[in-house]
Structures are given as C-alpha cells and as structure tokens.
C-alpha cells in the first residue's frame, strides 16, 4: 500500500515536471531567455511556479528565474538587502507574477531593511494581485 502511494506521488510529480517543461519555450520567449526577476542573461534558468500553485501549471503563474533567484526564494531568511535593491524597480513590473514575488521578497527584507519598508509604503498593487501576494509567503 505504501509503495503504491509513493509510486503515485512520484508519477504525479513527474507529470507536473513534464507539464512545466512543456511551458519552457513559451517562458523563454516571454522572458527573452533572461531571469524574469533580475534580467540576468547567460545563466541557467528554471521554471518557478508562484505559490499557491494551481492544479495544472499555468504560464501566467510561472516565472523563468536564475538559480540564484530560486535559491533566494527557497531560503528567504538568507536574503541580503543590498543584493536585492533591484526589487524597488521589479515590483512595478507589468507582469502580476513578478509583482507578487517581488512584493513577498520585499516583505521578507522589510523585517531588517529600511529601504524595503520604504518601497512597500509606496507600492500599489491591483486588488487581485495584492490578494495573490498575501495568499502565501516566502
């Protein structure tokens, strides 16, 4: 019984990975093969689903980001303020998924960075985007 549940979980994970890979070309085209958070080019990029994830991968809720950004999102307590001051501009992106991730990162940084608190005080997000941003945290 346990083995069949583990097998089912693995199959579900593999199916999701394949579905994300299917978005790869469209993500690369949209991102112009650059990290959608920092604009960094010439580095390995990977798909990042902005939580909470939907039942099926959705390109509008998925970003193409660098390994450095992925690591920062996985371990937000290690964010270094000076390295992320670009968030002051990124949060104004026209893409909701970028706004959500930037907003969440700013809130993590605001616990110890004055500049992040100042940016948050100035940011205005569309109601729907703000609800998405507040629905989860890093």
Would you name each region that the model predicts?
Residues 2-6:
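N-terminal alpha-helical interaction blocks
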Residues 7, 73-112:
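Polybasic, low-complexity binding patches
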Residues 65-69:
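Zinc-coordinating Cys/His ligand positions in small cysteine/histidine-rich zinc-finger domains
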Residues 120-126:
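OB-fold/S1-family RNA-binding modules
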Residues 129-138:
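C-terminal, charged low-complexity interaction regions
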């Amino acid at each position: 019984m346990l083995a069949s549940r583990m097998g089912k979980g693995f199959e579900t994970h593999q199916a999701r990975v394949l579905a994300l890979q299917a978005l790869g070309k469209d993500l690369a085209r949209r991102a112009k093969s650059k990290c959608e958070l920092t604009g960094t080019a010439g580095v390995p990029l990977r798909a990042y689903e902005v939580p909470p994830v939907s039942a099926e991968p959705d390109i509008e809720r998925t970003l193409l980001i660098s390994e450095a950004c992925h690591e920062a999102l996985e371990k937000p307590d290690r964010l270094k303020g000076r390295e992320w001051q670009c968030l002051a501009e990124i949060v104004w992106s026209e893409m909701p998924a970028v706004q959500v991730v930037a907003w969440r990162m700013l809130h993590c940084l605001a616990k110890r960075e004055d500049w992040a608190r100042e940016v948050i005080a100035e940011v205005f997000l569309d109601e729907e985007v703000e609800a998405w941003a507040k629905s989860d945290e890093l």
